[in-house]
């Protein structure tokens, strides 16, 4: 949200880093490789961060979530996809504009929202492991149980590809507050095998 306190804090910290000598690029600058920006950045000897294209980097969106920056991390033959809060129109553009590979890891879009994680995207990436950052069962945004994060539509769309879905937090009773589900989800890879370790539990 362009007017939120979180956005303001981000901009303050970003501007401070730039003033201290860091270089800031937008996703579109990276995709177009302008002013020294690159589409791909080597994070280590065998790990690369790739900026993916989606049309709302340069078009006006009706939903601010569609301005999300999308990344593909590659480690040898392993692929890890991050789409932020990208909605269905953005996902459609993402699939159309990029040669997306099958992905060993997918960070579930928009907290498992029914307006993201579309069959069109999932049928291409066919994720093996999905991690969702949300409070499962919370009615903060809706009273409709089917649409509470992670939504039933999300579960139905992911189910053909994997049952390895991890969720950070859960709530059964608002009065009792939130409790850890899987908790902090740590995915590690030796380049061959992915291992998931969670601070709460390893249930899927």
Where are these regions (language model features)?
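Non-globular, low-confidence helical/coil segments that flank catalytic cores
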Residues: 1-204
């Amino acid at each position: 949200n362009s007017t939120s306190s979180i956005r303001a804090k981000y901009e303050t910290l970003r501007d401070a880093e730039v003033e201290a000598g860091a270089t800031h690029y937008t996703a579109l600058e990276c995709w177009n490789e302008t002013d020294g920006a690159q589409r791909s950045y080597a994070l280590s000897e065998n790990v690369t961060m790739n900026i993916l294209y989606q049309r709302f980097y340069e078009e006006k969106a009706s939903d601010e979530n569609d301005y999300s920056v999308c990344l593909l991390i590659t480690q040898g033959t392993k692929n890890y996809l991050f789409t932020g809060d990208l909605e269905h129109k953005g996902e459609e553009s993402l699939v159309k504009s990029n040669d997306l590979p099958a992905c060993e890891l997918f960070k579930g879009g928009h907290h498992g929202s029914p307006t993201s994680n579309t069959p069109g995207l999932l049928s291409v990436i066919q994720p093996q492991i999905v991690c969702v950052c949300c409070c499962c069962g919370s009615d903060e945004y809706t009273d409709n149980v089917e649409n509470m994060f992670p939504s039933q539509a999300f579960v139905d769309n992911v189910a053909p590809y994997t049952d390895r879905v991890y969720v950070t937090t859960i709530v059964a009773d608002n009065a009792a507050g939130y409790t850890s589900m899987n908790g902090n989800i740590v995915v590690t890879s030796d380049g061959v095998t992915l291992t998931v370790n969670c601070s709460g539990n390893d249930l899927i």
